């Protein structure tokens, strides 16, 4: 067999990646996990379990729901519907087809169900199987996830955002003294299930414990304890210890000495040892727990107390008469002086009392005695009355309701997470499979609540990430599925009971529409299913990694307090403390940290390196917030020697509660993997983040997501090293699926012959069709450009084509421009930005925006609408861009008002006279009246038509334009097929040639004689078909040729079949909405150059609006004549405290000057003035050992590398581990620049130097999608409001500028009476006045008469609505 990897001499593409000088000191041992893994894992792996055999599927996601809902039985148990397995069919359309046709990308779900019919003997009740029917039932189309972690719903890309919610389990907290006026802490506990009723326990101000179910009326907690089967004695024994007082004649009572029950106080009586009679402490002396422990350790076991000590104690069992066994006092009753007298009189020797003291309060006992319910039945009925007021309470109904509330798995579910949390908090060991409440749970919740009241233990922190978990896509959709399947269950039971079960098949019972509508509703309307932010690749990634506390089952932004929104110590390495929206959602919508991942229970985990005996290992362990609390964790920048031993006497470590302690190296358990793990992806792209104020960093990370993809992309000179990861994981770039050799490349596609050998040894072919000028969700342009050349060898996952906002496989949101910090004629007042004309001229910040316009031809009551060029009352000039069908040509330049698609609609006719009817009957039908309803370019839009799509209903004949577009698409498919076949044929026939050469022919084509030995020249003279006719003597060779032929034919057949299927899809009509005959979509691309009013920003939260574009000759320039591109205000820095931008500017200045130095060295080398060693030495000084592989290569390779950095040297300064001020100075020194980073600038207008040195450097700036073209418009005449008759407001309504109250004051202050009158009348709501004014303008006169404004009439009507009749009386002036 031929090896596909023979003769690969080309350099692998991975060496073509951009090299950055990295300032990071910390050695990375863990790679950044795939940034969209959270979406894909949750949906595909955990919910759908795609591509997993039925037998190997775990009981989770879809499998677990189907298992829990089925089997379904009818009421009489005759029919039983069981679930066997499920599988997905292939989706009808692929992702691209769904986007173009406005369809949802989904796969049909087929569930195999088994219907068993039983025969029940009426006399004996025995059941026998009567029949079994198994059938595959269609359950609807289930949306599939694209490879980029998104869903396509009705043609638009959507993202399902993960939700943060409170974890199921039990939580204890108090009211912080806010409820009671005294400031007393009222403790409470809440059991939150995943599904089911909430259970609350709470103390009131009198220290009685209550409980509530679903926030209904409260009841005594002991009512619930009785309802779960506990009696008074069991309650007392569970919650209290008991101590026995023994009577010692004439001395008092002896009781066991327990030092734990002693608190510091002064004794009211002597402390006497009951066994020896010794007085240990006199009355009035102080005893402390420490002293008590000392006495206990030297043998004090029992102490003597007086008779009066028993008064006020509570009995721990019933007090009985020793002779008659009569109950004198019940358990829990207080011992009074009278009762003590009875005890003495009856000579009762032992009295058992409850241990109630300051460490163990009488709360349960008091609640028990306040509660009127004495048995389980009355307690259950009491609960029933609260939950079902008005219904008669009987014990059966009450018992059933109580059981269903908390103990029925169908109605109550704590979930596995809830059970784990419950076990951990209550110190229980109940199986994780039991996800309902147990009696032990309820008993222990009350126990812990009482202990908290007694001052033992601490309350839970609800903002701790151990108590908040993430519900990702899979889980959110799983919940919707459950709702749908529960509805299906009800309908199945109804259908089973209604019809004749014997003749029914499983598909007759299941109505899939119920499930489809629930899933569709979730994807279309849920708050968590969002229109994807597709401004640029970073905004896509951030959207997929977003965590929202809002949404169903979450918080509401109006009621969320400061604590929920605040940064919590457990966010470290899990949730970014920087990236969150400004405004009312601050802190409620967060972003996952770069290295964070979500575990199977939904808790966020962060990676740490394990430390053993003071040595840092390379073992990476992911810990959740709960686990992290058990360890001491050092920082990533802790000093470590070459062997990994932690340096220093003490190491700064984080411990539980977010506190920092200094510990010895051997006590450290883990250290951080990298300082970058703290922040999110967007924040990790900000160089010198550590030098910026957090508020500005927040703005910086948010504004990067608003950067518009530019025509010319350029990666930042000063980056952080994460740019490549973001570009790769975003899906904007094209990655190679397999190792291979590039066979063909053009701007539209890349063809790669893979090196993955198939079973038959033939290569497969990967064809990558690139996206060209496609519209994104936010009207930005998606365009992919190839990076590879023919003959390149590419490795799997190498980037072979750049997408929007990427440059050589790195994210590139803006451009590097030369910036000076300098005030310039007030044009950079208040953060305004002054730009050079060069930026506009050379399209530095020019972007393409694509808008989509759609027209639908419908079948109306009066007849069908028609797309045509024949439009009434339209000049030929207006139709110049339309083809013969009436649709605009691709490439046409259009402006506002131009016709894009000509369309006419039938008009209703006026009634016709009998004479006209007769004439029509004789001379034939006259053409119907039609009106023009063409699609025009809206105001404010102009550009080039880049694409036209035509969709026709099935059965409707296609027009010429649709046929031409279809033909073009078929040719494209045929080219893909032919290229793939050609590569396979080349391989197959070269293999065939190798097999045949040197063998003796037995028979063959006519021109070949038997007995000849085959040579290469002989084979060249034969056609491909004739090669298969050759038969040689060697039987083994013939067998191998036979196999090759079979595989070749199969492959060719498969390619033809795939081509035919795609063509059939193209040629069959489209599924259009009801009544639509044809849909035409026109895409217009507009080039937006930078202009005054556009918003720009840096990466450090420094934003501003362009105030003026200055000619190059007027801009400040350097001594070498280089003109500054942008002038910024130096006053924008000190108060904002984002010093990172200055460091970036300095390093950018070093970058550009180092590049100049390298270019000079290369020029000198080419002129033979220096040898390559000097270049090597300089590169080694600059980059260090990172580029040894280049320096050890060929001279051409070194010069090629130097040419790549001729515009600027690329730096990486990782977040919190980047370049320090000294590093920046070192680079400036290496570039032969002043260490201040400042230079002399010359004023372009005067030619004179500025008075002071100016900070100049290359800085990375972004153009944001707040473009002035989309904000400012002008109105001459336009629509008016119906009621007030005033012009509308806003661009979308083509409205005017509001002249409000304060503006009127301004005119009054200037005494501009006529202008004011004009503003308030004819330019606003004086209807008659404005008509007269218009007439006078048309006639060329300049006088106008103002009347009564409509707002006056509105005011009069307002008075009338208040029953005040106001009349306007006009009196003639004298």
UniProtKB/Swiss-Prot annotation:
Keywords for the protein's UniProt record, in alphabetical order:
DNA-directed RNA polymerase, Nucleotidyltransferase, Transcription, Transferase
Pfam families xref list: RNA_pol_Rpb2_1 (PF04563), RNA_pol_Rpb2_2 (PF04561), RNA_pol_Rpb2_3 (PF04565), RNA_pol_Rpb2_45 (PF10385), RNA_pol_Rpb2_6 (PF00562), RNA_pol_Rpb2_7 (PF04560)
What GO molecular-function term can you cite, just one?
DNA binding
Q: Which Gene3D superfamilies match?
A: 2.40.50.100, 2.40.50.150, 3.90.1100.10, DNA-directed RNA polymerase, beta subunit, external 1 domain (2.30.150.10), DNA-directed RNA polymerase, subunit 2, domain 6 (2.40.270.10), RNA polymerase alpha subunit dimerisation domain (3.90.1800.10), RNA polymerase Rpb2, domain 2 (3.90.1110.10)
Asked whether the UniProt record includes DNA damage among its keywords, one would answer no
InterPro entries to which the protein is assigned, alphabetical: DNA-dir_RNA_pol_bsu_ext_1_sf, DNA-dir_RNA_pol_bsu_external_1, DNA-dir_RNA_pol_su2, DNA-dir_RNAP_su2_dom, DNA-dir_RNAP_su2_hyb_sf, RNA_pol_bsu_bac, RNA_pol_bsu_CS, RNA_pol_bsu_protrusion
The UniProt record lists the EC number as 2.7.7.6
Which chemical reaction does it catalyze? RNA(n) + a ribonucleoside 5'-triphosphate = RNA(n+1) + diphosphate
A Gene Ontology biological process in which this protein takes part is: DNA-templated transcription
* An annotated GO cellular component: DNA-directed RNA polymerase complex
Q: Which PROSITE patterns match?
A: RNA_POL_BETA
Q: What is the role of this chain? A: DNA-dependent RNA polymerase catalyzes the transcription of DNA into RNA using the four ribonucleoside triphosphates as substrates.
Q: How does it assemble?
A: The RNAP catalytic core consists of 2 alpha, 1 beta, 1 beta' and 1 omega subunit. When a sigma factor is associated with the core the holoenzyme is formed, which can initiate transcription.
Q: Which family does it belong to?
A: Belongs to the RNA polymerase beta chain family.
Name by which UniProt lists this protein: DNA-directed RNA polymerase subunit beta
What does the organism's lineage look like at the top? Bacteria, Pseudomonadati, Pseudomonadota, Alphaproteobacteria, Rickettsiales
């Amino acid at each position: 067999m031929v090896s596909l990897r023979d003769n690969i001499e080309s350099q692998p593409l991975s060496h073509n990646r951009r090299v950055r000088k990295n300032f990071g000191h910390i050695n990375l041992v863990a790679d950044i996990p795939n940034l969209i893994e959270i979406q894909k894992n949750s949906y595909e792996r955990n919910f759908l379990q795609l591509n997993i055999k039925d037998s190997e599927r775990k009981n989770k996601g879809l499998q677990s729901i189907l298992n829990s809902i089925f089997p379904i039985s009818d009421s009489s148990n005759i029919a039983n519907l069981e679930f066997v397995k499920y599988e997905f069919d292939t989706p009808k359309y692929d992702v691209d087809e769904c986007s173009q046709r406005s369809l949802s990308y989904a796969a049909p779900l087929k569930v195999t169900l088994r219907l068993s019919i039983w025969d029940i003997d009426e006399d004996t009740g025995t059941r026998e199987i009567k029949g079994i029917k198994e059938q595959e039932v269609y359950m609807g189309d289930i949306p599939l996830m694209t490879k980029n972690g998104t869903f396509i719903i009705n043609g638009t890309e959507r993202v399902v955002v993960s939700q943060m919610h409170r974890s199921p389990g039990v939580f204890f907290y108090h009211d912080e003294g806010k409820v009671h006026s005294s400031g007393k802490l009222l403790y409470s506990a809440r059991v939150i299930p995943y599904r089911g009723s909430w259970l609350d326990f709470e103390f009131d101000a009198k220290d009685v414990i209550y409980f509530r179910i679903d926030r209904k009326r409260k009841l005594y907690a002991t009512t619930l304890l009785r309802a779960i089967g506990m009696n008074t004695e069991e309650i007392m024994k569970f919650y209290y210890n008991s101590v026995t007082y023994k009577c010692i004649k004439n001395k008092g009572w002896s009781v066991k000495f327990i030092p734990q029950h002693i608190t510091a106080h002064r004794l009211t009586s002597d402390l006497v040892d009951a066994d020896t009679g010794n007085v240990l402490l006199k009355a009035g002396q102080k005893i402390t727990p420490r002293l008590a422990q000392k006495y206990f350790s030297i043998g004090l076991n029992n102490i003597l107390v007086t008779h009066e000590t028993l008064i006020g104690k509570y009995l721990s069992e019933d007090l009985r008469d020793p002779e008659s066994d009569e109950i004198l006092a019940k358990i829990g009753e207080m011992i009074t002086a009278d009762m003590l007298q009875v005890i003495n009189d009856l000579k009762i020797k032992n009295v058992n009392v409850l241990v109630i003291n300051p460490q163990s309060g009488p709360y349960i006992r008091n609640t028990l005695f306040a509660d009127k319910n004495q048995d389980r039945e009355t307690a259950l009925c009491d609960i029933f009355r609260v939950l079902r007021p008005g219904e008669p309470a009987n014990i059966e109904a009450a018992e059933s309701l109580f059981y269903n509330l908390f103990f029925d798995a169908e109605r109550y579910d704590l979930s596995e997470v809830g059970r784990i949390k419950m076990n951990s908090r209550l110190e229980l060991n109940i199986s994780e499979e039991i996800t309902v409440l147990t009696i032990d749970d309820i008993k222990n919740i009350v126990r812990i609540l009482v202990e908290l009241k007694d001052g033992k233990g601490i309350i839970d922190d609800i903002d701790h990430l151990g108590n908040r978990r993430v519900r990702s896509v899979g889980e959110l959709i799983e919940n919707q599925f459950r709702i749908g399947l529960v509805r299906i269950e009800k309908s199945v039971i109804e259908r089973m009971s209604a019809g004749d079960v014997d003749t029914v098949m499983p598909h007759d019972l299941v109505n899939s529409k119920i499930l489809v509508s629930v899933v569709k509703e979730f994807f279309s309307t849920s708050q968590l299913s969002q229109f994807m932010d597709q401004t640029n690749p970073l905004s896509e990634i951030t959207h997929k990694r977003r965590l929202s506390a809002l949404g169903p089952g979450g918080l509401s932004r109006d009621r969320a307090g400061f604590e929920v929104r605040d940064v919590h110590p457990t966010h470290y390495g899990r949730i970014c403390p920087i990236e969150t929206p400004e405004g009312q959602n601050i802190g409620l919508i967060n972003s996952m940290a770069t290295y964070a991942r979500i575990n199977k229970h939904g808790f966020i985990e962060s990676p740490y390196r394990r430390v053993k005996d003071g040595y840092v290992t390379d073992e990476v362990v992911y810990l959740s917030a709960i686990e992290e609390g058990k360890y001491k964790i050092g920082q990533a920048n802790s000093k470590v020697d070459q062997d990994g031993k932690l340096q220093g006497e003490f190491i700064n470590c984080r411990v539980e509660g977010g506190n920092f302690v200094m510990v010895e190296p051997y006590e450290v358990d883990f250290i951080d993997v990298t300082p970058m793990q703290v922040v999110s992806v967007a924040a990790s792209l900000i160089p010198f983040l550590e030098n910026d104020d957090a508020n500005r960093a927040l703005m910086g990370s948010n504004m990067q997501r608003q950067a518009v993809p530019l025509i010319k992309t350029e990666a930042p000179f000063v980056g952080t090293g994460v740019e490549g990861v973001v570009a790769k994981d975003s899906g904007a770039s094209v990655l190679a699926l397999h190792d291979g050799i590039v066979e063909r490349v053009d701007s539209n596609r890349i063809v790669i012959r893979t090196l993955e050998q198939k079973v038959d040894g033939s290569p497969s072919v990967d064809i990558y069709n690139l996206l060209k000028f496609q519209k994104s969700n936010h009207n930005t342009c998606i365009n992919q450009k190839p990076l590879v050349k023919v003959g390149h060898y590419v490795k799997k996952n190498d980037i072979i084509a750049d997408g929007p906002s990427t440059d050589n496989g790195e994210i590139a949101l803006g451009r590097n421009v030369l910036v000076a910090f300098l005030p310039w004629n007030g044009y950079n007042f208040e953060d305004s930005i002054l730009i050079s004309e060069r930026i506009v001229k050379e399209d530095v910040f020019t972007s393409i925006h694509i808008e989509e316009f759609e027209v639908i031809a419908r079948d109306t009551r009066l007849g069908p609408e028609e797309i045509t060029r024949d439009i009434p009352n339209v000049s030929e000039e207006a139709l110049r861009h339309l083809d013969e069908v009436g649709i605009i040509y691709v490439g046409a330049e259009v402006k506002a008002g131009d016709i894009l698609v000509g369309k006419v609609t039938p008009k209703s006719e006026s009634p016709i006279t009998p004479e006209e009817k007769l004439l029509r009957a004789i001379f034939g039908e006259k053409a119907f009246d039609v009106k023009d309803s063409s699609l025009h370019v809206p105001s404010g839009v102009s550009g080039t038509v880049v694409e036209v799509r035509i969709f026709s209903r099935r059965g409707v004949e296609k027009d010429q334009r649709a046929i031409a577009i279809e033909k073009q698409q078929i040719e494209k498919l045929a080219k893909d097929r032919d290229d793939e076949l050609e590569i396979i044929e080349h391989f197959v026939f070269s293999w065939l040639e190798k097999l045949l050469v040197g063998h003796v022919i037995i028979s063959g084509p006519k021109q070949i004689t038997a007995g000849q030995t085959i040579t290469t020249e002989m084979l060249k003279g034969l056609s491909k078909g004739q090669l298969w006719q050759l038969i040689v003597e060697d039987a083994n060779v013939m067998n191998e040729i036979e196999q090759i032929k079979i595989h070749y034919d199969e492959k060719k057949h498969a390619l033809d079949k795939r081509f035919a299927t795609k063509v059939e899809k193209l040629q069959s009509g489209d599924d259009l909405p009801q009544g639509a005959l044809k849909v035409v979509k026109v895409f217009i691309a507009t080039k937006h150059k930078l202009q005054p009013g556009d918003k720009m920003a840096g990466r450090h939260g420094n934003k501003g609006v362009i105030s003026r574009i200055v000619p190059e000759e007027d801009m400040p320039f350097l001594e070498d004549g280089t003109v500054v591109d942008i002038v910024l205000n130096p006053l924008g820095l000190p108060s904002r405290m984002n010093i990172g931008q200055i460091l970036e500017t300095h390093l950018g200045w070093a970058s550009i000057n180092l590049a100049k130095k390298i270019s000079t060295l290369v020029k000198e080398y080419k002129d033979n003035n220096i040898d390559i060693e000097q270049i090597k030495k300089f590169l080694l000084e600059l980059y260090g050992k990172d580029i040894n592989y280049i320096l050890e290569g060929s001279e051409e390779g070194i010069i090629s590398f130097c040419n790549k950095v001729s515009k600027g040297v690329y730096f990486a300064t990782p977040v919190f581990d980047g370049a320090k001020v000294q590093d920046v100075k070192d680079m400036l020194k290496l570039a032969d620049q002043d260490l201040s980073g400042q230079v002399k600038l010359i004023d372009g207008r005067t030619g004179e130097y500025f008075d002071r040195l100016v900070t100049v450097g290359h800085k990375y700036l972004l153009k944001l999608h707040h473009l002035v073209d989309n904000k400012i418009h002008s109105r001459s005449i336009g629509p008016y409001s119906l009621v007030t008759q005033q012009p509308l407001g806003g661009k979308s309504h083509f409205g005017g500028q509001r002249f409000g109250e304060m503006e009127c004051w301004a005119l009054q202050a200037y005494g501009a009476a006529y202008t004011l009158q004009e503003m308030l009348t004819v330019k606003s709501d004086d209807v008659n006045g404005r008509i007269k004014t218009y007439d006078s303008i048309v006639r060329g006169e300049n006088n106008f008469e103002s009347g009564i404004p409509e707002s006056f009439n509105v005011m009069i009507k307002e008075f009338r609505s208040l029953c005040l009749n106001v009349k306007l009386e006009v009196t003639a002036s004298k």
